[in-house]
């Protein structure tokens, strides 16, 4: 069974590209099995919350980090769980 890892993704996102483009740096902490899934989650998250197209997201860095270094409390709490009952 694969182990879930914690990734930090740094990107530059162009918001409102069609009218008045505004670039902004984004840092997102993600729990995923590999870098590809972490990147896909970022695209999905920014697309659904901010209506940003994939070609408006420029990835600067994807790095695996220890759970303790994650600044997002939700990510740290999810890492502590042994199992989830639905």
Curated annotation (Swiss-Prot):
InterPro entries: Ribosomal_eL20, Ribosomal_eL20_dom. One of its GO terms (cellular component) is ribonucleoprotein complex. It comes from the Archaea. One of its GO terms (biological process) is translation. GO terms for molecular function: large ribosomal subunit rRNA binding; structural constituent of ribosome. Keywords: Ribonucleoprotein, Ribosomal protein, RNA-binding, rRNA-binding. Belongs to the eukaryotic ribosomal protein eL20 family. Part of the 50S ribosomal subunit. Binds 23S rRNA. This is Large ribosomal subunit protein eL20. It comes from Sulfurisphaera tokodaii (strain DSM 16993 / JCM 10545 / NBRC 100140 / 7) (Sulfolobus tokodaii).
């Amino acid at each position: 069974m694969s182990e879930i890892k914690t990734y930090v993704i740094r990107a530059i996102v162009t918001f409102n590209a069609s009218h008045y483009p505004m670039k902004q740096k984004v840092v997102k902490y993600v729990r995923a099995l590999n870098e590809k899934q972490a990147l896909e989650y970022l695209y999905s998250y920014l697309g659904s919350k901010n209506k940003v197209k994939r070609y408006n997201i420029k990835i600067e860095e994807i790095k695996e980090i220890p759970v303790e270094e994650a600044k997002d409390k939700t990510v740290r709490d999810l890492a502590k769980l042994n199992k989830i009952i639905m």
